[in-house]
């Protein structure tokens, strides 16, 4: 885990993951509504599944790549 996120609550980690995905979504080629969905999925992965922020972002990125490949 990143030292910057080591002493933060799950809610703060979820917000960080959602923010990272939201900023990176356009680079990944996502449409605006897809960015919102991906950020929400990343936040839920942290809150409900206990994933790390980095793991949640990686999962969102994999999903974005898979969707882009299917189009």
Annotate each language-model stretch with its function.
Residues 7-27, 33-47, 53-68:
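Amphipathic alpha-helical segments in structured regions that serve as interaction surfaces
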Residues 2-6:
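Long, non-catalytic architectural segments outside compact domain cores
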């Amino acid at each position: 885990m990143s030292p910057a996120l080591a002493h933060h609550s799950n809610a703060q980690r979820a917000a960080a993951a959602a923010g990272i995905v939201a900023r990176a979504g356009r680079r990944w080629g996502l449409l605006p509504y897809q960015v919102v969905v991906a950020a929400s999925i990343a936040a839920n992965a942290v809150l409900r599944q206990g994933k790390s922020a980095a793991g949640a972002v990686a999962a969102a990125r994999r999903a974005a790549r898979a969707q882009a490949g299917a189009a």
